[in-house]
């Protein structure tokens, strides 16, 4: 049975294996744990003591938030875990005016079903040496 947690305090780096599939340089489990704990808001999906998914938000806590990461382990995809993670995270961010994210075009229907709208523009910098 999948359970959910809104804190990474009880998570260890050893529980964070198999994420960041396809990334040219993946964060180490220790770095992954650091980003979970440093996020303004987090939701974590667990199958027993195995972390199978997570979503994070960074925010000013007043008006805006950005969702940089949503990941579900490949073996657990297509079970609505990602949907539940985002739904729970949006509940944590309910008082904010804007919640933004960037995603690949093929993921737009997933996020649209959760209430997100396509925005016209977005830009970014990727510094792989900092992963």
Task: Give residue spans per PLM region.
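Short amphipathic alpha-helix that is part of the acyltransferase structural core
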Residues: 1-30, 122
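Conserved active-site alpha-helix within GNAT-family acetyltransferase domains
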Residues: 95-131
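Conserved beta-hairpin
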Residues: 35-55
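Small/polar loops that bind or transfer phosphate-bearing groups
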Residues: 8, 68, 102-103
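A conserved beta-turn-beta hairpin within the catalytic core of GNAT-like acetyltransferases
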Residues: 58-67, 77
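Conserved acetyl-CoA-binding loop-helix of GNAT-fold acetyltransferases
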Residues: 72, 78-91
